[in-house]
Amino acid sequence: MGLSDQEWQQVLTIWGKVEADIAGHGHEVLMRLFHDHPETLDRFDKFKGLKTPDQMKGSEDLKKHGATVLTQLGKILKQKGNHESELKPLAQTHATKHKIPVKYLEFISEVIIKVIAEKHAADFGADSQAAMKKALELFRNDMASKYKEFGFQG
C-alpha cells in the first residue's frame, strides 16, 4: 500500500501549493467538511455556534484551526510514510481527548482532495489525485492502528 517515489513527489508538489496559502486552504477544508458532514461539527465545541456559511467564513478561529490541521498533515506527508514520530501524538489526542472517529478522517480526506482539485485544477490531475488519495489512505490506516493501541475503536 506504500507509495512510489513518483507518487510521493506528486503529493509533495501539490502540497507545496497548499502550503502557499495554508490558512485559506485549511479554512475552506473545514467549512466544506462542516457543510458536507454536519455531524463532524459536534466534535468541535468551540465551533458549534457557527451555524451559517457566513459565520464560518468570518471566523478567524476556524481559519486558524484549519491552518493547524493542514500544517500537521503536511508534516506527516513530508515523512513519506515514515511518520511514526509525527503520527503517534496526533493519534493519541484524536483517540483519547477528541475522540475523532476514523470515518471523520475519511470525510476530511475526501474534502481535502475536492478543495485542492478546485483550487489547483491544472496541477492536480487524475494521477496526482490518485497519489494523494493513496497518501491520505495510508495516513488514515496508520491513525486507525494507533487508535487501537490507545484503546479507541473509532
Swiss-Prot record:
Keyword field contains Transmembrane: no
Q: Name one GO molecular function term.
A: nitrite reductase activity
**Localisation per UniProt entry:** Cytoplasm, Sarcoplasm
UniProt GO cellular component terms: sarcoplasm
Catalytic activity, per the record? Fe(III)-heme b-[protein] + nitric oxide + H2O = Fe(II)-heme b-[protein] + nitrite + 2 H(+); H2O2 + AH2 = A + 2 H2O
- InterPro entries documented for this protein: Globin (IPR000971), Globin-like_sf (IPR009050), Myoglobin (IPR002335)
Give me the residues that bind O2, please: 65
- The UniProt record lists the EC number as 1.7.-.-, 1.11.1.-
- EC supergroup of this enzyme: oxidoreductase
Family per record: Belongs to the globin family.
Q: How does it assemble?
A: Monomeric.
Q: What does this protein do?
A: Monomeric heme protein which primary function is to store oxygen and facilitate its diffusion within muscle tissues. Reversibly binds oxygen through a pentacoordinated heme iron and enables its timely and efficient release as needed during periods of heightened demand. Depending on the oxidative conditions of tissues and cells, and in addition to its ability to bind oxygen, it also has a nitrite reductase activity whereby it regulates the production of bioactive nitric oxide.
The name this protein goes by in its record: Myoglobin
| This protein's encoding gene | MB
